[in-house]
């Protein structure tokens, strides 16, 4: 998946 999504998830978590 896109690393951008991981960044968004990291902000949420």
Curated annotation (Swiss-Prot):
It comes from Lithobates clamitans. This is Temporin-1Ce. Coiled coil: none annotated. GO terms for cellular component: extracellular region. The keyword Secreted applies. It is found in: Secreted. The modification Leucine amide is found at residue 13. Keywords: Amidation, Amphibian defense peptide, Antibiotic, Antimicrobial, Secreted.
């Amino acid at each position: 998946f896109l690393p951008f999504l991981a960044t968004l998830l990291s902000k949420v978590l």
